[in-house]
From Swiss-Prot:
Function statement: mRNA decapping enzyme that specifically removes the nicotinamide adenine dinucleotide (NAD) cap from a subset of mRNAs by hydrolyzing the diphosphate linkage to produce nicotinamide mononucleotide (NMN) and 5' monophosphate mRNA. The NAD-cap is present at the 5'-end of some RNAs; in contrast to the canonical N7 methylguanosine (m7G) cap, the NAD cap promotes mRNA decay. Preferentially acts on NAD-capped transcripts in response to nutrient stress. Also acts on free nicotinamide adenine dinucleotide molecules: hydrolyzes NAD(H) into NMN(H) and AMP, and NADPH into NMNH and 2',5'-ADP.
Example of a GO MF term: magnesium ion binding
Lineage of source species: Eukaryota, Metazoa, Chordata, Craniata, Vertebrata
Organism: Homo sapiens (Human)
Effect of residue 356 to A: Loss of decapping activity towards NAD-capped RNAs
UniProt-reported outcome of changing residue 318 to A: Partial loss of decapping activity towards NAD-capped RNAs
Name of the protein described by the UniProt record: NAD-capped RNA hydrolase NUDT12
GO biological process, one term: NAD-cap decapping
């Protein structure tokens, strides 16, 4: 009985595929209305109805099947998708239909379970306490409080020192220089020459406030240890270094900032991004007049009384963040990933493709556009994974998995230098053996590395 059922099903599948190949939409509709599960059924050679319609040049059938939710990412035994077939046979209209159809069915190898994770630059020591930014009296009192911590920047580079025991065989830690009021009070006396940002208060209540008992009136003590970022000019920075020989300004930012402890890196990401904004917006973007710093460093106020920016809330008055999509593009069969490289990269380094989101664009559309612009590969399903602040100067890297619906690579040399498909085995070797391989990927503190590892983890049996 089971063999009879199998034979009957095979006959129906064959009729369904033949109607797609012949362009018989009436017959196709009739079969599908009685047996909707046939939509993505494959023949012995792995072909679907969508592939047969694409091969034989029937755009109306392709459109119909797409509207029914047909999976564009299925790969036949020749490793082709429906889009690959349409491109090979020169059916441009069908290729455009397949390439521009948004979304698509989630492939079997992508899980719904995406755990929230904290990437490098996203952890912090501080509670930002944004409600205190308008309290000028509180901020002023905290500036001179003996427990307050100041971190110094010059040209956006943080002042650091090497921690650890000199007799230790371990690599010394790069730590932020945590300064106090007496270290920097001369700079605070010249507000026109500095940029001061309130970063927040320490999350953990520590005993160090007890060390200053009696120095601050009890009624003024709230138990909060404030942190500020202080930007000074290069001349002042050089003078400071001469007085503090154990400290130095950490540069260039990449890869130097990746040496910091994770929670200190989060503080630097916050401070560096806001300081970078101030360095670029000394004058009002609306009228060109001079501006002044307000709200603990989180606003610039135009000094021209009739400036339109003073009426209402305007994004030009507040620190900006630039959203960037970064995506691990997965081959339609799930066994390979697409990585690319720019000319400025170290020799042999490949990473996930990335690009800025344009105005009026969704995350998903930005992923599809950027991948096609840089590599020529078409993308269907897009799934968010995680994000990472990236203070170069102030980006938010939005990490996604993207399922390719085509496989041919056509690199735009104006965008990137190279792009290639890499097998899971190749990527695993790189992650375990590092630079001993023919190529390498970014370090573990970059979200690209985490996206690549995420793809490896969800495909253990491929």
């Amino acid at each position: 009985m089971s063999s009879v059922k199998r034979s009957l099903k095979q006959e129906i599948v064959t009729q369904f595929h033949c109607s797609a190949a012949e362009g018989d939409i009436a017959k196709l509709t009739g079969i599908l209305s009685h047996s909707p599960s046939l939509l993505n059924e494959t023949s012995e050679n792995g072909w679907t109805a969508l592939m047969y319609a694409a091969r034989n040049g029937h755009p109306e059938i392709v459109q119909f099947l797409l509207e029914k939710g047909c999976d564009r990412s299925i790969v036949n035994k020749s490793r082709q998708t429906a889009l690959d077939i349409a491109v090979f046979w020169g059916y441009k209209h069908i290729a455009n239909l397949l390439a521009t159809a948004k979304g698509g069915k989630k492939p079997w190898f992508l899980t719904n379970e995406v755990e929230e994770c904290e990437n490098y630059f996203s952890k912090t020591l501080l509670d930002r306490k944004s409600e205190k930014r308008n309290n000028s009296d509180w901020l002023l009192a905290k500036e001179s409080h003996p427990a307050t911590v100041f971190i110094l920047f010059s040209d956006l580079n943080p002042l650091v020192t090497l921690g650890g025991n000199k007799e230790s065989f371990q690599q010394p830690e790069v730590r932020l220089c945590q300064l106090n009021y007496t270290d920097i009070k001369d700079y605070l006396a010249q507000p026109e020459k500095i940029t001061l940002i309130f970063l927040g208060v320490e999350l953990e209540i520590k005993d160090k406030l007890l060390n200053y008992a009696g120095e601050v009136p009890r009624e003024e003590e709230d138990g909060l240890v404030a942190w500020f970022a202080l930007g000074i000019d290069p001349i002042a920075a050089e003078e400071f270094k001469q007085r503090h020989e154990n400290c130095y300004f950490l540069h260039p930012p990449m890869p130097a900032l990746l040496q910091l402890k994770e929670k200190e890196a989060g503080v630097v990401a916050q401070a560096r991004s806001v300081l970078a904004w101030h360095s670029r917006y000394k004058f009002c973007p609306t009228c060109g007049n001079a501006t002044k710093i307000e709200e603990g460093g989180y606003k610039r106020l135009c000094l021209k009384e009739d400036c339109p920016s003073l009426n209402g809330v305007h994004n030009t008055s507040y620190p900006r963040v630039d959203p960037v999509v970064i995506m691990q593009v997965i081959h339609p069969d799930g066994t390979k990933c697409l990585l690319g490289r720019q000319k400025r990269f170290p020799p042999g380094m490949f990473t996930c493709l990335a690009g800025f989101i344009e105005p009026g664009e969704t995350i998903e559309d930005a992923v599809r556009r950027e991948v096609e612009e840089e590599s020529g590969v078409k993308v269907g399903h897009v799934q968010y994974v995680a994000c990472q602040p990236w203070p170069m100067p102030s980006s938010l890297m939005i990490g996604c998995l993207a399922l390719a619906v085509s496989t041919e690579i056509k690199v735009d040399k104006n965008e990137i230098e190279d792009a290639r498909w890499f097998t899971r085995e190749q990527v695993l070797d790189v992650l375990t053996k590092g630079k001993q391989q023919a190529f390498f990927v970014p370090p573990s503190r970059a979200i690209a590395h985490q996206l690549i590892k995420h793809w490896i983890r969800i495909n253990p049996n491929l």
